[in-house]
């Protein structure tokens, strides 16, 4: 109970209670209650600050609500565009510069989230690189086998240092379960020998470099299609670190040595290799989560050029082509893709080239791939087609772009990236045009093999999502089956390149550059058919698009917190237009449309139409009013031809002794307009009393005259009537009329005379005489003449009852008259005119000038003014303050009119009574 009692007190009361309390436990409870009150006050202030932050835009500013909504939509669109830009930016320095230049809080929040994302990717990539390096000693058997393969393929080569031999190989460890979360895509291009050639030995499981890729699933192709001959040279390739050193060119490897190496038997085509089994096993057990493949959907601009290059004349390949010892990726790709020097001499060899089997290859990811085998080309030609030349040129452009990636300097740090690759990655986020027309073949690496080169080559492109991976090209030379593998650490969406035995190349793009592919979307295959050297025909390019879906835009914030999709499908109904809304003349129809419409733009149009309609109606009413006024002014004769009726009644009464004579004169003027719409009635009653006093030889007479005027006007066009009367003696009643000063003086003189007469005569006799004269006048008016004077007399008797508005106005007039001439006083109402207390002080000072010095008062000191006026009125005229000083201070600039009117009315009664007492004493 004590705690509840303390909870009901405010902080001041608690502190006073703390001062007078001696018990320690009680003082502790009081302090706890004070702290709780302070905490609640802080919470309320924080809530008030939080609610005021956007109040001007969203809540209080009702007039600019549409503008604030539009501004908010623009801000959301700008944030969405910034999120798209940040998704394609992967440089921490560039993001930091953008963060320093950003001024908005929401933009800075998005940029910080993007910086955290990039740093997390770099840390993840560095961790993976550390795991790979920790497994370095386990690759000893591979090193020995690959060194043997290098010496076998190039017997005349000088042995290189041990360090370079370790750099030449690529460590492909078995992936751990935690490694499978990274987006890694390996695209394998497999070249197999034709049926007539001698097969090579199968690859051992630990010699297969593709076993480290858990995602692609390659089916054995030997049972489904005839194998083809490899188009590449079997010479070993040096490491990229040897690129800057100029060394003499090396002669091509003789075909005899090549045949000597490849003379190992190969199992039947229906037997799958151990490598394919290992790949299948990893892909079946360790599938990547489809939700984690979004980051792998960025495009590689090197593999999808913007515009097709013009065809070039075929280059003569008759001369001996010598490979230099250069470590660039361009030379390595040319070794795999360019024609061998023996091609020109052996045109009659078996059919050349293939890059992979036509069997469908499944790639996990957000897209579903369907591969359609193309029909064999039936056209034969002895000369190369322009498509061949264009394809070779695209191969050279691809190699040149990859060489630029390798030749660029690396960034600092363990996970350095090439500068060119970084620019490509930063540009990959934006939309790029991807040509899918039949006239623009994709850049597929197509080459022709050598006769007798019965080796098979695997061209592998690993596309990893790790940021810290070094983008270096490496050549793997396994021992068992002489498979050459080129791995490029490039970031790109998954791309499948395959070629069947009949010379058909197939390229499949899983996602277009710069777009976000939704889960479950299907991308059909783009088939590019290329004939073999023995069967050189035209170029077929076929694209099978998806059925059209309603376009949708996916916006993903940089921090990955929220994702909004805006469907841009065609609307079911046509949008409203401003012309249709302008044609509607009914406000009710527009109001119903506004209630039923949910689209923001349409609601804005409907509101604009409502405003225009209301403005038109207002203009129409104003024009009609002006027209009626002009018509009234155009008929001045009619306005003067009003019918006026005036009735005058005079009644005199004389006492029996002749000492008192009373006269009552009543004049009634009734004016009717010509059309009968307006009526004005004026009644004037003049009472005159004369008394003669005779004292011996001298006689004197006193005359008192009272004039009372009542006016009443009515109009049949409106139901309201205007009544004019007075129950107060107002000093400024005739101040606005012409000659107001003379009339005011005359009236004041009459009032003084009447007051003196009333005080000198017995009150009973005067009141009785007045009542008797009025009764006689009414009787005479009702007895003679038509009924109009009778009605006028009845109206005049009931006219003296005022309404509330007239009472307030007359009280304001009395206060204004009493405070005329006082500084800082302007009485116009019962609210703001009395807010500073100067009007109260002026009203009291007018009756009691000696009570206080009005000149010392100031409107700024409101409390002193209220205390001075209220205390003086209570002390001098016994007027109890019906309103407190604290209430007036709390109400501020606009106090309650009812409170002020009640107190002013009480003040009027007391001051008026005091004034009458003063007049009685003076008389």
Curated annotation (Swiss-Prot):
Signal peptide per UniProt: none
Molecular function terms, GO-annotated: actin binding
Amino acid composition bias (Pro residues), ranges on this chain: 237-252
Domain of life: Eukaryota
Record bears the keyword Phosphoprotein: yes
Coiled-coil intervals, chain numbering: 24-89, 601-628
Compartment(s): Cytoplasm, Cytoskeleton
N-acetylalanine modification, residue list: 2
Cellular component per GO, a single term: cytoskeleton
Region (Disordered): 134-456, 542-578, 615-772
Keyword Phosphoprotein found: yes
Record's compositionally biased regions (Low complexity): 164-179, 192-205, 366-389, 697-721
Keyword annotations from UniProtKB, A to Z: Acetylation, Coiled coil, Cytoplasm, Cytoskeleton, Phosphoprotein
Comp. bias (Basic and acidic residues): 615-638, 744-756
Phosphothreonine PTM positions: 359, 372
Modified residues (Phosphoserine): 299, 301, 304, 340, 501, 521, 574, 641, 735, 798
GO aspect biological process, one term: negative regulation of systemic arterial blood pressure
InterPro entries the record matches: CH_dom, CH_dom_sf, F-actin_Monoox_Mical, SMTN
Domain Calponin-homology (CH) span(s) in chain numbering: 805-912
Entries under Pfam families matching the protein: CH, Smoothelin
Listed Polar residues bias regions: 272-285, 293-314, 674-687
Family, similarity comment: Belongs to the smoothelin family.
General function of this protein: Structural protein of the cytoskeleton.
Name the UniProt record assigns to this protein: Smoothelin
Source organism of this protein record: Mus musculus
Classification lineage: Eukaryota, Metazoa, Chordata, Craniata, Vertebrata
